[in-house]
Amino acid sequence: MIRLGLSASVTALNRDAVRTSIDEAAKAGATAAQMQEVVSLVSGLGVHSLMATAVPIALAAQVESAQFTPEQQMLWEKYVGNDPFWSDFETELPHFLGAMLRLSSEQFIAFFEYCSVPWKSGQVRARLKELIAMACDATPAHRFAPGFRLHLRNALKLGAGRLAVMKALELAAETPPHEGWR
């Protein structure tokens, strides 16, 4: 399943590796719903563009430290609140969520709605999803350190051992570069 996530991620999109990974996952007993959940999870890599740009854009627009409007405050409470996950997230990506909300309430809502999809059905265990996300953030073509640290911590909290982490990183290192999808 980790190999499927890596090969299907936007940083690789390797057609042969995707096919092989699907075949291997199916032979190992993975269901179509589980495979789809993994692909849904890794499709979220695109939000890293938001993470890398929201604060600089908000600073340039001079809205980074503006007070939330009442609507924005309501959205903040609904989606972020006091959830420990988002507190840890803010440690890795300081001010991102607030900057994104100040720039676009619609994007803020869409971020939370889209990123939550693979966490709703529970087809794949959370620990495995964290290992997959961590591996995707560690591929040679991506190297997204804030996400790597966050997902590593989460995987460890969920009981992932050293061997599982090392295997995920090994698979990440072997991920082929994106050569286009024809």
Question: Model-flagged regions — what are they?
Answer:
Residues M1-N14, L128-F144:
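Amphipathic, charged-and-aliphatic alpha-helical interface segments
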Residues S9-A28, S49-L128, R153-K157, R162, ...:
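Acidic, glycine/proline-rich low-complexity segments that act as flexible tails and inter-domain linkers
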Residues T31:
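Arg/Lys-rich, alpha-helical DNA-contact motif
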Residues S40:
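Phosphate/adenylate-binding glycine loop and adjacent helical scaffold
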Residues G147, A164-R182:
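Preference for long, well-ordered alpha-helical segments
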